[in-house]
Amino acid sequence: MSFDQVIADALQALRSRFGADILSEQATGEGFPVLWLAAPAWEAAHRFLREEISAPFPLLADLWAIDESQRQHRAGQPASRLTLCSHLVSLERNADLRLKLATDGRAPSVAGVYANADWYEREAHDMFGLDFGRETRRLLMPPTWEGHPLLKTHYARATEKPPFVLTDRLFEAEERATITDPDLLGLPGLRDGEELMVLNFGPHHPSTHGVFRILLGLDGEEVVWAWPDIGYHHRGVEKMAERQTWHGFIPYCDRVDYLGGVISELPYLLAVERLCGIAVPPRAQMIRVMLCEFYRIMNHLLFYGTMAQDVGAMSPVFYMFTDREKGHEILNAITGARMHPAFFRIGGVAMDLPRGWDAMVRDFLDWMPGRLDEYERMVLRSELFRARTVGVGAYDTDTALTWGTTGPGLRATGCNWDLRKQRPYCGYEQFDFEVPLGQRGDIFDRTRVRADEMRESLKIIRQCLENMPEGAVKADHPLTTPPPRGAMQTDIETLIAHFLQSSWGTVVPAGEATGQIEGHRGLTQYAIVSDGGTQSYRTRIRTPSFAHLQMIPEIVPGMTVADLVAHIASIDFVMSDVDR
């Protein structure tokens, strides 16, 4: 059955069930349907797609809002002040579906259908003031924050406000606001008549791997309940995207996940290139793939070492950092930077590979397999490591999808879902590699999957080395490349266009587009809205870490605090990826 037939079947089922409540189908060129629903059908349609339809949509990949108040190009769309969007994925169909709801600031909740919608709706309330008809606390902003930052009326720069002065009264108010009462959160204070100890784990604790707090209810060493508290690392990157040029936002992508390097640049650029109709040359595609796999290895080495360290093995992390240094030397030689290269460009990459790159890469490929063999002996075959990880923090595929888990955390349950295979991009269909899978979905399997993924990344990099095509590293397109100098000297229109693009910025056609990749942590997705200007009207960044942390209260009750530390390490997150 073709993709069109698969998705047509789902659309027909929706139309048969909801009829006139489907207001319109938006033409976006996304490659998946975008449907506008009436408010009364919002929750019911989500429940139908998740629970009742054949080949359901069990994964709520993202849910976000758009402030439409200043948007000029939205012909054919229902009138809306705030638009609510949900992005659903059916693994069985290998298909996506986006639903939209026009609101006046109030929307039905789908948290009773998709458990992971809770944080997404709290974020939409926090950023846009959307009222979901239930109690919603701020998620990313401090509880004392005034206003909703992603509204177009909210300031974007500190200079738009009077200078900040921390008075004694303000300090006391901020301090009081940090107090979290478990009773107000509906968390029990007693167990079998005995009072639980409430412990603040973080936000400044080495085992939280960043500024992340978990409020714990403990009965001795046993975790009875856990309440994650995020937002301490929030920088407002989606707001920044609205005041940067399309090219100027690329360096900010590196900071969304500061260990991923160019990986976070790729989905953003795929979205922009889709909107502009830009075809990336084969050599640039393969350079992109090679660098993404290098950064996948760099991230997994850091995970591998710190995972072992968090269960008591001190040596591996030092060996693995030595190998990361070798990899970063290659990345520095190719991109000019180690961790934040800002190397990809709309239509390709910033520059061609340097002289001697192949010898450096070949040396690394010859070096690493033996090192990975040694790490397997040190870590995965260690009886102590296995005792601390096998059967601990286990969950199944259904639980993973319920909470929006993707990437190694999903594949550790045995679910074979990797966008590089299921929906190849950047030419991944040309490469021969396997998708490592686990069986139990426990801490050990999550570690094993990432260890095996490094071997597969080495295979992909070697194929890039041996099959790197000749040719351009950037598309010959007016939105990506300056025109020939000779044309500028003879044609005034060409000169004017070049001047405007260099000074004012690239103008991207009005519309919507989405870029998806299999990042080192899971599904990374950028959904962009252009209003026909030099800046994004709305950039929505779906990061895997955000979804993965929300799952903690489901998994950790019954664990000891020591096992909680191991479980947190096995998630493999960075708080910049969570808080954005």
Swiss-Prot record:
Pfam annotation, one family: Complex1_30kDa
Segments of this protein annotated with the region NADH dehydrogenase I subunit C: 1-171
Subcellular location: Cell inner membrane
Region named NADH dehydrogenase I subunit D: 195-580
Catalytic activity: a quinone + NADH + 5 H(+)(in) = a quinol + NAD(+) + 4 H(+)(out)
Its EC number(s): 7.1.1.-
InterPro entries referenced in this protein's UniProt entry, alphabetically: NADH_DH_suCD, NADH_Q_OxRdtase_suD, NADH_quin_OxRdtase_su_C/D-like, NADH_UbQ_OxRdtase_30kDa_su, NADH_UbQ_OxRdtase_49kDa_CS, NDH1_su_D/H, NiFe-Hase_large
MF terms (GO), sorted A to Z: NAD binding; NADH dehydrogenase (ubiquinone) activity; NADH:ubiquinone reductase (non-electrogenic) activity; quinone binding
UniProt keyword annotations, A-Z: Cell inner membrane, Cell membrane, Membrane, Multifunctional enzyme, NAD, Quinone, Translocase, Transport, Ubiquinone
Gene Ontology, cellular component aspect: NADH dehydrogenase complex; plasma membrane
Membrane topology: Peripheral membrane protein
Keyword tRNA-binding in annotation: no
SUPFAM superfamilies: HydB/Nqo4-like (SSF56762), Nqo5-like (SSF143243)
Similarity comment text for this entry: In the N-terminal section; belongs to the complex I 30 kDa subunit family. In the C-terminal section; belongs to the complex I 49 kDa subunit family.
Assembly and binders: NDH-1 is composed of 13 different subunits. Subunits NuoB, CD, E, F, and G constitute the peripheral sector of the complex.
Function as written in the Swiss-Prot or TrEMBL entry: NDH-1 shuttles electrons from NADH, via FMN and iron-sulfur (Fe-S) centers, to quinones in the respiratory chain. The immediate electron acceptor for the enzyme in this species is believed to be ubiquinone. Couples the redox reaction to proton translocation (for every two electrons transferred, four hydrogen ions are translocated across the cytoplasmic membrane), and thus conserves the redox energy in a proton gradient.
HAMAP family hit by this protein: NDH1_NuoCD_1, NDH1_NuoD
Protein name listed in UniProt: NADH-quinone oxidoreductase subunit C/D
Naturally occurring in which organism (per UniProt): Cereibacter sphaeroides (strain ATCC 17025 / ATH 2.4.3)
